Amino acid sequence: MELNAYIDHTLLRPSASEAEVLRLCQEAQHYRFASVCVNPCHVALAAGAVRGTAVRVCSVIGFPFGTHVTEVKCAEAQRALDDGAQELDMVVRIDKVCAGEREVVEREIAQVAARCHARGAIVKVIVETALLDEMHIAFACSCVEAGHADFIKTSTGYASRGGTEGDIQCFKKYLKGETKIKASGGIRTRAQAQRFIELGCARIGTSNGVAIMEERAS
């Protein structure tokens, strides 16, 4: 698979305009990226812009801190799906991961995943690895799998750092099933993206997709 097919072309700035979202969608179609990832308020716009193409629409749930209560995350997910989202990146309750509250974490993931899967959509669970040690990452991997999420994702882009090679290796150490991995946060170059793919990532989240593709052309 070519690099472009791994990229979730991302625009999550709170100041992003509708014109910028439409440009994001045009770029995604031109470069044949896997998806566009936009804020919930822009899902319907993006869905209309890429309708009839292979580009999927992704949005975020409980973003960026994961501190929404489960009922709100479920409502967010339902609205995004109704607006045309095919993929949802949900921030887990990081405080509950750190506290080891398995039932709370697994139940929340499972509830959002069930809504997604009922509509033929996928869910990626963001665990914000910058805030976790290895023990917490192992716990998060277990919860993500138990909740039947499709992906585990490193980062929101709002913490002190994005995903690292060490994070990916840690995921691979503790994931036991078919859960896929998405790397994100600070991925700005072609070499970085390719390295994460070599490590086993199935998706790359980046707002620098065009620059990464143009790097090849130059």
UniProtKB/Swiss-Prot annotation:
Recorded catalytic reaction(s): these are: 2-deoxy-D-ribose 5-phosphate = D-glyceraldehyde 3-phosphate + acetaldehyde
Indicate the segments annotated as coiled coil, or none if absent. Answer: none
What are the annotated GO cellular component locations? cytoplasm
- Subcellular localization(s) per the UniProt record: Cytoplasm
| UniProtKB keywords | Cytoplasm, Lyase, Schiff base
CDD domains listed in its UniProt record: DeoC
EC id: 4.1.2.4
A GO molecular-function term, please? deoxyribose-phosphate aldolase activity
SUPFAM superfamilies of this UniProt entry? Answer: Aldolase (SSF51569)
Q: Where is the active site?
A: D89 (proton donor/acceptor), K153 (schiff-base intermediate with acetaldehyde), K182 (proton donor/acceptor)
Q: Does the keyword Zinc apply?
A: no
Q: Which cysteines in this chain are paired by disulphide bridges?
A: none
Which is a Pfam family this sequence falls into?
Answer: DeoC
| GO annotation, biological process | 2-deoxyribose 1-phosphate catabolic process; carbohydrate catabolic process; deoxyribonucleotide catabolic process
Please indicate if the UniProt record lists Cytoplasm as a keyword: yes
Task: Please give the pathway this protein is involved in.
Answer: Carbohydrate degradation; 2-deoxy-D-ribose 1-phosphate degradation; D-glyceraldehyde 3-phosphate and acetaldehyde from 2-deoxy-alpha-D-ribose 1-phosphate: step 2/2
Q: What is its main location?
A: cytoplasm
The record's listing under InterPro entries reads: Aldolase_TIM, DeoC, DeoC/FbaB/LacD_aldolase, DeoC_typeI
First-level EC class: lyase
Task: Tell me which family the UniProt entry assigns to this protein.
Answer: Belongs to the DeoC/FbaB aldolase family. DeoC type 1 subfamily.
Q: What does this protein do?
A: Catalyzes a reversible aldol reaction between acetaldehyde and D-glyceraldehyde 3-phosphate to generate 2-deoxy-D-ribose 5-phosphate.
**HAMAP family reported for this sequence:** DeoC_type1 (MF_00114)
**The protein's name in its UniProt record:** Deoxyribose-phosphate aldolase
What gene is this protein translated from? deoC
